[in-house]
């Protein structure tokens, strides 16, 4: 933990450079597991840079992918419990938005060094359609040419990965449309229409359903962001 204290203290000393280059620091993980003084250093770094948006430094600390996913599920359950979401709003797409990495795109390329051929519970959800490159070189010895090899492998597989990603997103959209259509059919039946209903009424209900869902989700995500910021502000009220 001494190394973490040194590094986060150094980041706080570099606030002018962070501001100059617009670096936003994000620390991803189960932070309450850490010693309180390190939590406070992290909170200061995160709050001091949260409005910068030129580049982003994501630091996974006290992090496992299984915890990240289970935490995202708990956050969605909290949203339903608080009345911010309907149970029907819960989806893979919403889970994406509840992950620690929600403000960053999924990685195109993940490099694992040291000859280990496993992800070690790291970004399991986010790397579904990423290029995974396993190399035997140790990290301290990683060179420009090792990076070139990894990038070349990514380029060779990019087309297939992009096709798989596009197909997956299209399937997500189709499933969401099916859920919306089922909701509209139920509403029409409650109003006494046949299952196919009036086409104009169906379109109106479908648009209303989509709009209301998006509004609920945006309200929930704002509440979730406020909840996370509040966690950091409680750790360093002076900086808040």
PLM regions with names:
Residues 1-240:
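Flexible, compositionally biased loop and terminal segments
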């Amino acid at each position: 933990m001494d190394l973490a204290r040194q590094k986060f203290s150094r980041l706080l000393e570099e606030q002018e450079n962070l501001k100059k280059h617009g670096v936003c620091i994000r620390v991803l993980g189960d932070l309450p597991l850490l010693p309180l003084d390190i939590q406070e250093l992290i909170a200061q770094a995160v709050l001091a840079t949260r409005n910068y948006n030129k580049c982003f430094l994501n630091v996974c600390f006290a992090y496992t992918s299984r915890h990240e996913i289970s935490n995202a599920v708990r956050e969605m359950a909290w949203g339903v419990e608080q009345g911010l979401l309907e149970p029907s709003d819960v989806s893979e797409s919403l889970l994406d938005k509840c992950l620690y990495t929600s403000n960053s795109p999924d990685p195109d390329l993940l490099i694992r060094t040291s000859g280990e051929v496993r992800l070690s519970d790291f970004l399991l959800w986010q790397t579904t359609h990423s290029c995974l490159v396993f190399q035997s070189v140790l990290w301290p010895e990683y060179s420009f040419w090792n990076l070139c090899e990894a990038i070349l492998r990514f380029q060779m597989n990019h087309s297939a990965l992009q096709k798989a990603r596009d197909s997956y997103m299209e399937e997500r959209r189709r499933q969401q449309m099916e859920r919306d259509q089922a909701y509209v059919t139920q509403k029409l039946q409650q109003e006494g229409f046949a299952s196919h209903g009036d086409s104009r009424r169906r379109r109106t209900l479908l648009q209303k359903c989509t709009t209301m869902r998006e509004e609920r989700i945006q309200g929930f995500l704002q509440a979730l962001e406020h909840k996370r910021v509040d966690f950091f502000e409680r750790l360093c009220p002076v900086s808040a």
